[in-house]
């Protein structure tokens, strides 16, 4: 009977998870590594002539703003784009993989890529890792079936919707889209609604911020617009706060000498031939 020479292994290793759980149980007060909170607001909607996608531009590292102008709308095909929320590295590499596969698919078949094909590739890839690839995606594009919009979750589930929003600011964005969305909207009305939805997510979520980027996709092509709107203008300081020495009184002062005790001293001569 034939057997595999090497056992198949997954792309992730969780060997240290049980170790961390044991250490946390044995050593009270131990701070084990925790999952990072990610923040983003991405949205998309279908209008009369195509699809429009939008995203904020803030990238965070826990409570630190790592990038104020992060591009979250990724190219997949000439008429298909994808917004990514979650771990920036995961969304970037996942969309790059999908773009390369669609380029090979177009060269081998001689046909333009379809939005459903891109969505299938993305959800199969994410389902394979069972949610450990932190990428929440909004895929939009125009093909021979007309304008289409999909949302793909990190575990591989997906939905086709006329409008959607994902990320930590999706609550405020979806509320605005549900209230004001109408079928067969004009480009101007759809763009205004999208900017207001992303702005609502930025103003209600600390993980979202920066500018509003948008991508308009029609049968004639796609147009990516960077910094379409700036909801929060940077505020300049009113002045410099430098206080002279002695402004704040010192209430108490205590100096403790640092005493060191030499426990053992060993001197070993080097052997020289």
Swiss-Prot record:
Self-association or partners: how does it assemble? The 26S proteasome consists of a 20S proteasome core and two 19S regulatory subunits. The 20S proteasome core is composed of 28 subunits that are arranged in four stacked rings, resulting in a barrel-shaped structure. The two end rings are each formed by seven alpha subunits, and the two central rings are each formed by seven beta subunits. The catalytic chamber with the active sites is on the inside of the barrel. Component of the immunoproteasome, where it displaces the equivalent housekeeping subunit PSMB7.
The molecular function GO annotations come to: threonine-type endopeptidase activity
Family (UniProt): Belongs to the peptidase T1B family.
Q: Which reaction does it catalyse?
A: Cleavage of peptide bonds with very broad specificity
Q: What is the effect of changing residue 40 to A?
A: Prevents the correct removal of the propeptide
What is this protein's tissue specificity according to the annotation?
Detected in liver (at protein level).
Give the phenotype of cells or organisms lacking this gene: Impaired response of cytotoxic T-lymphocyte (CTL) to dominant epitopes of lymphocytic choriomeningitis virus (LCMV).
Marked site positions, Cleavage = 39-40
Catalytic residues (UniProt): 40 (nucleophile)
- For this UniProt entry, what is the primary localization, expressed as one broad class? cytoplasm
Q: What function is annotated for this protein?
A: The proteasome is a multicatalytic proteinase complex which is characterized by its ability to cleave peptides with Arg, Phe, Tyr, Leu, and Glu adjacent to the leaving group at neutral or slightly basic pH. The proteasome has an ATP-dependent proteolytic activity. This subunit is involved in antigen processing to generate class I binding peptides. Plays a role in determining the T-cell repertoire for an antiviral T-cell response.
Could you tell me the keywords of this UniProt record?
Answer: Acetylation, Cytoplasm, Hydrolase, Nucleus, Protease, Proteasome, Threonine protease, Zymogen
Q: Which residues form the propeptide?
A: 1-39
Look up the EC number in the record and give it.
3.4.25.1
Task: Tell me which Gene Ontology terms the entry assigns under biological process.
Answer: cell morphogenesis; proteolysis involved in protein catabolic process; T cell proliferation
Instruction: Please provide, in alphabetical order, the Gene Ontology terms of the cellular component aspect for this entry.
Output: cytosol; nucleoplasm; proteasome core complex; proteasome core complex, beta-subunit complex; spermatoproteasome complex
- Protein name as catalogued: Proteasome subunit beta type-10
Protein induction: Up-regulated by interferon gamma (at protein level). Up-regulated by IRF1.
Cell location: Cytoplasm; Nucleus
């Amino acid at each position: 009977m034939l057997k595999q020479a090497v056992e198949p292994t997954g792309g992730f290793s969780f060997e240290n998870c049980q170790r961390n759980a044991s250490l946390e149980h044995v050593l009270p007060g131990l701070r084990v590594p925790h999952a990072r909170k990610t923040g983003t607001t991405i949205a998309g909607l279908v209008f009369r002539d195509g699809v429009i996608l939008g995203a904020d531009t803030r990238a965070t590292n826990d409570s630190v703003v790592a990038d104020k102008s992060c591009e979250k709308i990724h190219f997949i095909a000439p008429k298909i784009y994808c917004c990514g929320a979650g771990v920036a590295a995961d969304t970037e590499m996942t969309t790059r993989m999908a773009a390369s596969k669609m380029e090979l698919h177009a060269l081998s078949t001689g046909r333009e890529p379809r939005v459903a094909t891109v969505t299938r590739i993305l959800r199969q890839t994410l389902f394979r890792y069972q949610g450990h690839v932190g990428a929440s995606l909004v895929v939009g594009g125009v093909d021979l079936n007309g304008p289409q919009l999909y949302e793909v979750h990190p575990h591989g589930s997906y939905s086709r919707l006329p409008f959607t929003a994902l990320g930590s600011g999706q609550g405020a964005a979806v509320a605005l889209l549900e209230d004001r969305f109408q079928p067969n909207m004009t480009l101007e009305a759809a763009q205004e609604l999208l900017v207001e939805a992303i702005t609502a997510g930025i103003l209600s979520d600390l993980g979202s911020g920066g500018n509003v980027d948008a991508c308009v996709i029609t049968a004639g092509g796609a147009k990516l617009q960077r910094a379409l709107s700036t909801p929060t203008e940077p505020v300049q300081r009113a002045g410099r706060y430098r206080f002279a020495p002695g402004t704040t009184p010192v209430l108490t002062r205590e100096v403790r000498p640092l005493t060191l005790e030499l426990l053992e001293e060993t001197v070993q001569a080097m052997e020289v031939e």
